[in-house]
Amino acid sequence: MSDRNLAVFTQIFERFSAGDMPGLLSFQSDEIVWDYRSEDFTEGMDNPLNNLWKGKSGITQFLNTLLTTQEVIEFEPRDFFANEDQVVAIGHSHWKVIETGKEWASDFAMVFTLKEGLVTHWRPIFDYTAERIAYQS
């Protein structure tokens, strides 16, 4: 199962890198949950992404918000690890918030839970503070 999950995960990153959001969504379950909340999550924070996103419509909203508020400078998954139902990616990303012109970068770990070849849960771990500061004027 872990080899199959790694193959799915590779497809997801390829779709994201190519800007193929419908293709990326095709690997998400209907009950998908993306947990993009920081440790100090507060509703209405300066970061419009900091939220719990549910369902494909929520993921679409997240992706639209991400792609209209930030530019990708670098997005590099470096290592992947898998077990029966999870895949973890370790990597580095570098972004620019369009409105403020501020850049931020961070190493990341992303934990994906899969069921029957579809992602049911996603949780990134990175420097949320750096991202939040980049959104501030």
Task: Map each language-model feature to its residues.
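Gly/Ser/Thr-rich helix-start
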Residues: 20, 56, 102
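Short, low-complexity N-terminal intrinsically disordered segments enriched in polar/charged residues
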Residues: 1-30, 137
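Short, flexible active-site loop motifs that bind/organize anionic cofactors or intermediates
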Residues: 11-14, 49, 121
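A beta-strand edge to alpha-helix "cap/lid" segment located at domain peripheries
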Residues: 1, 67-137
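Charged/polar, solvent-exposed surface patches and flexible loops
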Residues: 11, 26, 61, 65, ...
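Hydrophobic pocket/interface hotspot
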Residues: 9, 24, 32, 55, ...
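A solvent-exposed, acidic/Ser-Thr-rich amphipathic alpha-helical stretch
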Residues: 29-84
